[in-house]
């Protein structure tokens, strides 16, 4: 037998202690029934029970680490869950890099577990294959033994030599000798059949107890558990790899939901990993104890009348099957010698046609039986069983133990690294700030003026004070009013001389500006002082009155009255403007003493439809809501907008 490997020695050297931390016997003895049986040998029972306790204590070490890690995570979450202080970007980047590096290390540990799982599976399959070979050999021996027994019993009983010998004859001495020899042949044949029957009896029973199972039953049970364990372990390790992938994606996208999902899922995976690590640790130590002295454990099964280890050299003088087989063969040889002796005696006493034919048939049958027993003896050679036994040990204590040890190491590493990942991930999503979207339009939310010089006056006619946003629809209206083709407002007559005309080329009037901001600048600001602001307002009132009279004459529509009402409201608003509004207007407007202000924008409620409780996205209300305000022309009287929402302008739009 080969010497134990270094791995077997390392696993066997792990201390076996009881709950008092005293070293105990490390001999492999996994029979739990023996542990629970009350025996007279109290010391032996205590040693066996303590050995089982040592394996349980080894398995409880990862369980203790699991409890400690869960308590630490609970304390961390209780102390840090309400801490919302903003962390520096450099600290967040370092944390993300650490998460990715630890995740890669965890994936490597999981890969080691996958490799060990495959090695352990292949080793068990090799051991199961060798066990099936031994089982097949035993079944073959059983069938051959039954066949030899049946043939010997039936053929020898069918010859009926005694009836031929008992016929009346003048030489009674020869007759008595022939009858005695015939009975000796029958007796030897019966004893040979009894020996073969005892072999069949041992083949039929694996152990003496009725609760014991055969080797084939153990192999089938082991294959059933392995068919569940191998794919389940493979699926669990694959799930761990997927969770690591989810964590990397969550760190890359800075997704709080993904990181929280990993924290919750990783918590359950930590529990399973630590428990599996405990099972692998105890199993590896037990396998190391078995592989250290496997022959001793197998030979102990001889006392339990296990026929499968009876072929091994366990210190017994000879194999019991070989003994029974040799006994049967010797008895058949004696029966054959008796038949030959009967043939010699019957040649002179009985006619050849009467008894010689029967004796020759008996001799042929005994010769065939002897030949079959010789073949069976070669099959029972211990070298064949030893070959399968060595293959089974090589698969179990070689690749199988290596795979189990790798799974133990991978389980411990994965549990430890996964615990760190859950800690770091919980720290990440607690302090993680939501990253702004890349496609967000800053111009939609940026203020009109910076906070340092924001005006206190409202841009929109009906907007509250101290707001710095303006509707893009109002800009379109003012641009259309100020950028017309005529130099004076319609119906103003000599407005050019009184109020300062607006030239077509924009030299003295309002020309086209970038982003349509000319009307806005002149519609919001007065030239220089409060007096000029008052005069400009008066001029604006005269111009707008003339404009609306002319507009009423051409269109005859209800909208002109509403528009005049909005202009008057806008003029009153301009009269109530505080001095701060004048400062803002001076900063934004165009400084000219004789310029005419453009037409004021429509009422804010009319444009946005806020009176009816609906947001019309910068357009006039529909004609079915207010038929009187319906206007003919393009777009049904609605103002075209560049976006569906209000556009907040920046300072770059004006300068």
Curated annotation (Swiss-Prot):
The keyword Transmembrane applies. Residues 446-576 are annotated as: Disordered. Residues 76-95, 253-258, 423-655 are cytoplasmic. It is a multi-pass membrane protein. The gene is Motor. One of its GO terms (biological process) is chloride transport. InterPro entries: Tweety. It is found in: Cell membrane. Pfam families: Tweety (PF04906). Residues 465-480 have a biased composition (Polar residues). Induction: Down-regulated by the miRNA miR-2b-1. GO terms for cellular component: chloride channel complex; membrane; plasma membrane. Keywords: Cell membrane, Chloride, Chloride channel, Glycoprotein, Ion channel, Ion transport, Membrane, Phosphoprotein, Transmembrane, Transmembrane helix, Transport. Residues 1-54, 117-231, 280-401 are extracellular. PANTHER family: PROTEIN TWEETY-2 (PTHR12424:SF18), TWEETY-RELATED (PTHR12424). Belongs to the tweety family. Disruption phenotype: Death during development. Glycans are attached at residues 18, 25, 171, 188, 211, 326, 372. It comes from Drosophila melanogaster (Fruit fly). This is Protein movement modulator. It catalyses: chloride(in) = chloride(out). The lineage of its organism: Eukaryota, Metazoa, Ecdysozoa, Arthropoda, Hexapoda.
